[in-house]
């Protein structure tokens, strides 16, 4: 009976260790999990925004290495997921962060971000795709969970009304080199005072003050 209890205790300890990000990070490596059929090598810089925020390759969309990234001692997310880039860009450019989420689509349900300087709460709101106002620089485009089962998040970097384009920065979308200081451009149309971004699965945008 005592030996059975000891074995059970050992098993529980092992399970607890395996459930921690540190254990995943120690066992997981790009060479083991994310080295085949990559759009670009894991960890390679894909591009850098005009403000100096770099985006890194995640190899391919279904690659997940449970290795946390930190910026000046503050957690920015799991390398190199879309949520990590969105959070890191906000930290650099708005002095804001947001809580941990299971998937990118879950950002849609967050109603406040946190100011890094003093920990105060900053209200944020959602605007559905097809609303009466375009997103602004710094807003987050949020995609439904139907996209790859996780959704996606991208940062609005520029709104070009003349060309009717929204230029975004992001990680883990196509994992390809950026054409310039942005990852890609999204067309939009205007109909009856409402604006539609022509991108599949897009819920809308999180308005960032």
Residue ranges and their predicted role:
Residues 160-209:
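Active-site signature of cysteine proteases
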Residues 1-11:
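Bacterial N-terminal signal peptides that target proteins for export
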Residues 10-19:
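Bacterial N-terminal signal peptides
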Residues 26-113:
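N-terminal capping segments
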């Amino acid at each position: 009976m005592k030996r059975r209890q000891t074995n059970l205790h050992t098993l529980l300890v092992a399970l607890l260790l395996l459930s921690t990000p540190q254990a995943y990070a120690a066992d997981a490596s790009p060479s083991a999990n994310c080295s085949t059929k990559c759009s670009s090598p894991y960890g390679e810089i894909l591009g850098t925004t005009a403000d100096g925020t770099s985006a890194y390759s995640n190899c391919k969309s279904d690659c997940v290495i449970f290795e946390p990234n930190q910026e000046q001692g503050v957690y920015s997310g799991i390398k190199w997921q879309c949520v990590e880039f969105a959070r890191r860009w906000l930290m650099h450019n708005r002095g804001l962060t947001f809580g941990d989420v299971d998937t990118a689509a879950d950002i849609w349900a967050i109603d406040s971000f946190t100011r890094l300087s003093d920990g105060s709460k900053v209200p944020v709101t959602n605007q559905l795709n097809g609303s009466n106002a375009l997103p602004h620089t710094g807003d987050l485009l949020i995609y439904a969970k139907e996209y790859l089962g996780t959704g996606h998040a991208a940062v609005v970097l520029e709104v070009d009304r003349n060309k009717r384009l929204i230029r975004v920065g992001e990680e883990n979308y196509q994992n390809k080199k950026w054409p310039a200081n942005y990852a890609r451009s999204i067309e939009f149309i205007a109909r009856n005072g409402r604006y539609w971004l022509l991108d599949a699965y897009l819920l809308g945008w999180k308005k960032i003050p």
